[in-house]
Design a protein with these regions (language model features):
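Metal-associated gating/positioning segment near the N- to mid-region
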Residues: 51, 55
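Auxiliary tRNA-acceptor-end handling modules of aminoacyl-tRNA synthetases
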Residues: 4, 19-40, 61-65, 73-260
């Protein structure tokens, strides 16, 4: 059980395996096959990504990096990342994972935490801490000298991230607010086994092949322009002809089959 444990659940709260139990409690062990265990793996993978970004792009500012359905993401204040950048980041992440850095949790009083992140020149982390109540103990995680503001929980070491892939990058706004800073979001996914990752990536590729956006462009049915926006397709004569045929077919069905 110790080999597959990712975290613990103490009285309903998911915690690190390093958590000291100093009183009677209800304890459950969370493994990599559990949904919560997969979240912990992916959360740790996001921290590994952030560490890799800071190594290869020292001027990048870190913001937030949660586990999400099917994977994780991390937002950075930096210029857009290319596919080559993502490949280089993957290689750096593999180094970090192989090095097996321990993820060590520590806390600081709120004012010390603000000063700590100011000294590291991480303004987004400072903003997050400043919104927390006075007197709050602020938790951080250190892995090989990379430190991130985080409530956790995390794996014991970076070696626990066994199978991952950076899937894409896109633009995002800080706090999801278009009036705030533009950020670059890197998406990734992680699984406990390489076979699970391979199966997931094959499903992604299959979905891309059947993507109506991709197929419609390749068939010359529509296009988009940045001035109008990517969410509003402009149909070509060929695409317009197809729509008219579909409309007539539906009208015939309504009249002949459905009676209205």
């Amino acid at each position: 059980l110790a080999r597959v444990a990712c975290a613990g659940e103490v009285d309903g709260e998911v915690v690190d395996l390093r958590t000291v139990l100093d009183k009677d409690c209800n304890l459950n062990i969370i493994t990599a096959s559990d949904e919560e265990g997969l979240k912990v793996i992916r959360h740790t993978a996001s921290h590994v990504l952030a560490q890799a970004v800071k190594k290869l792009f020292p001027d990048a500012k870190i913001t937030i990096g949660p586990a999400i359905e099917d994977g994780f993401y991390y937002d950075f204040d930096h210029a857009p990342f290319s596919r080559e950048d993502l490949d280089n980041l993957e290689a750096e992440m593999k180094k970090i994972i192989k090095e097996g850095h321990e993820l060590k949790r520590f806390t600081l009083p709120r004012e010390e935490a603000i000063k700590f992140m100011q000294e590291r020149n991480e303004p987004y982390k400072v903003e997050l801490i400043e919104e927390l109540p006075e007197g709050e103990e602020i938790s951080f995680y250190d892995q090989g000298g990379f430190v991130d503001l985080c409530a956790g929980p995390h794996l014991m070491t970076t070696k626990g991230v066994k199978a991952f892939k950076l899937t894409s990058s896109s633009m995002a706004y800080w706090r999801g607010n278009s009036d705030k800073a533009r950020l670059q979001r890197i998406y990734g996914t992680a699984f406990n086994k390489k076979e699970e990752l391979k199966e997931y990536l094959e499903k992604l590729e299959d979905a891309k092949r059947r993507d109506h956006n991709k197929l419609g462009r390749e068939m010359g049915l529509f296009t988009t322009v940045d001035v109008i926006g990517q969410g509003l397709p402009l149909f070509t004569p060929k695409g317009t002809k197809m729509i008219m045929k579909l409309q007539r077919w539906i009208e015939d069905l309504e009249d002949k089959e459905w009676g209205y």
